[in-house]
Amino acid sequence: MIVEPKFRGFICTTSHPTGCKKNVENQIEYVKENGKIEGAKRVLVLGASTGYGLASAIVASEACDAEVLGVSFEREAKGKRTASAGWYNIESLKKFSEGEGKKFISVNGDAFSNEVKSEVIDLIKENMGKVDLVIYSLAAPKRKDPVSGEVYSSCLKTVGAPFTSKTLDFHTGEIQDITINPATEEEIEGTRKVMGGEDWMLWIEALKEADVLEKGVKTIAYSYIGPEVTYPIYREGTIGRAKNDLEKTAGEINKVLKSLDGEGYISVNKALVTQASSAIPIVSLYISILYKVMKEKGTHEGCIEQIYRMFKELYEGKLNLDSENRIRIDDLEMAEDVQKAIEEIWPQITSENVFELSDAEDFKKEFFKLFGFGLEGVDYSEDVDITTV
C-alpha cells in the first residue's frame, strides 16, 4: 500500500517502512564515516527502538563492533495499519547487522515486567555470556509495578502552581499561550514510578544476581536539564521530579556495582525533536529556536552525533563530568552564547515571525522523519509492504 502521514494531535499514527530504514541507514553511515571506538563488546540497550536508545544500539554495533541485545515495546503491522516507527527501526537495524555478520538480538515486550527481565537474562546467558554496558533509555506513559501489580501513569504537569508561557503548534506554525496546571501528589508519584530510577535499579539488581554483568560493567541512563525558560514544565515539574529520582539512583547503582568495579552514570543530553519532546508544551518552541541558533554557530547535533561523542568520551577516558558526577553532553546547548541568543529571541517571537526567528520548519521536518517521512532518496509514491523492511 501507499503510506502517508496521518495525525492524531501530536501523534503520527502511521510510519513508513522504507523511510524508517533509510533513517537507520543514515545514522549507520554517520558512525562509519567517523570511525571505530575501542569500547564495549556486549551491550544491553533497554529502550532501543527510537531516539537516544536507537542511537546507542547503532553506535555500540557499528563503532564498537559490539554484540547488542535491544529491548523495546513496539507494534507490528496489522491489516492496513502500519507498524510503529520503532518496530521498523529495530527490524532495519537487525537486517543491517546481519548483513555485516554482526550479532543483534531484539526482544519486543514490556521492559518493566519480570517476564521480560527473565527472558533477557536467559538470552544473555545463551548468546553473550555477560554484558559490559547497560543503556537505560525507556520512555513510557504507564508502568505496571511488578510486585504490587498496580499500574502507574506519568504526566506532564507543573508542581505547586500553574504556569503560563508560549508554545509552538508546529503543524500550523502558530505561537499560542498555554497554561499548564499543577499535578496532584498522586500524579507526581505516578510519574516518578514510571520515569524515575526504580526500574533501572531493578534491572541492575536482576542482572547482577543472575551473574550476567562483566567486571568493570558500566550502565548509563539518559536525562535532561535544559534552561530556565523550560524549568516550570520540565526540570521543576513532574518529569523533573522523576529525573531527580533517576539521577539519585545512579549513586545507589554505583554501590550495587562496587564489587564488580562497575559504574552507574547519568548522561545529560541535548534537547532534540523526539516523539516525547514534540508533545511537551513550551519545549517545542525552545527546540525550534535552539536548532536555529546552534546551526548558525555550527554546533548542532542530532541523536547519533550526541551518542557517538558520548561513547567516544566514555571509552577514551575524557568524560565531561559535572559536580554531581553527571556526563554533560548538553554542553554545546548550554553554552553561554547559545543560551544568551535564545533569551534574546524568546520574548520577540510571534506567529508572524516564527519561521524567521526559529527553525520551526525544520522542527516539523525532523518530526516527520521520526516516522520515516520526508527522507531524501525514498519514493513515497511507491507501493510498500508494511509488514517488513
Swiss-Prot record:
Superkingdom classification of source: Bacteria
Pfam families: Eno-Rase_FAD_bd (PF07055), Eno-Rase_NADH_b (PF12242), Enoyl_reductase (PF12241)
Residues bound to substrate: 224
Keywords: Fatty acid biosynthesis, Fatty acid metabolism, Lipid biosynthesis, Lipid metabolism, NAD, Oxidoreductase
EC annotation from Swiss-Prot or TrEMBL: 1.3.1.44
Record: residues binding NAD(+): 47-52, 73-74, 110-111, 138-139, 243, 272-274
Metabolic or biological pathway: Lipid metabolism; fatty acid biosynthesis
UniProt record, GO biological process: fatty acid biosynthetic process
Active-site residue numbers: 234
Enzyme class, spelled out: oxidoreductase
UniProt-annotated site: Plays an important role in discriminating NADH against NADPH, residues: 74
One function term, GO molecular function aspect: trans-2-enoyl-CoA reductase (NADH) activity
Catalyzed reaction equations: a 2,3-saturated acyl-CoA + NAD(+) = a (2E)-enoyl-CoA + NADH + H(+)
Subunit organization: Monomer.
Known role: Involved in the fatty acid synthesis (FAS II). Catalyzes the reduction of a carbon-carbon double bond in an enoyl moiety that is covalently linked to a coenzyme A (CoA).
PANTHER family in alphabetical order: ENOYL-[ACYL-CARRIER-PROTEIN] REDUCTASE [NADH]
Family according to the record: Belongs to the TER reductase family.
Name of protein: Trans-2-enoyl-CoA reductase [NADH]
Protein species of origin: Clostridium perfringens (strain ATCC 13124 / DSM 756 / JCM 1290 / NCIMB 6125 / NCTC 8237 / Type A)
